[in-house]
Design a protein with these regions (language model features):
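Short, Lys/Arg- and Gly-enriched loop/turn segments at beta-strand edges
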Residues: 64-68
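A basic, amphipathic helix-loop patch mediating RNA/tRNA/ribosome contacts
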Residues: 11-54
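A detector for short, charged/polar N-terminal pre-domain segments
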Residues: 1-11
Length: 68
């Protein structure tokens, strides 16, 4: 599990995936979201520009990211 400390009100989902090094590029982040490989608060979510906020949980490739 990764704990990500949010700076500001939110972070777009694709930027979060890059920030915690779960993907190598923005293009890769967009592809994994589009392919339904990312879960947001336990549900598959296809929104690339999803605003992830404090208290949210993102899961990808066996790794969970808790937003604090």
């Amino acid at each position: 599990m990764i704990k990500f400390t949010l700076q500001g009100e939110f972070i777009p989902l694709i930027q979060l995936l890059k920030a915690v090094d779960l993907v190598g590029s923005g293009g890769e982040a967009q592809m994994v979201v589009q392919d339904g490989l990312v879960k947001y608060n336990g549900e598959v979510d296809y929104r690339k520009r999803l605003k992830v906020k404090k208290g949210d949980k993102v899961e990808f490739n066996g790794t969970t990211v808790n937003i604090i």
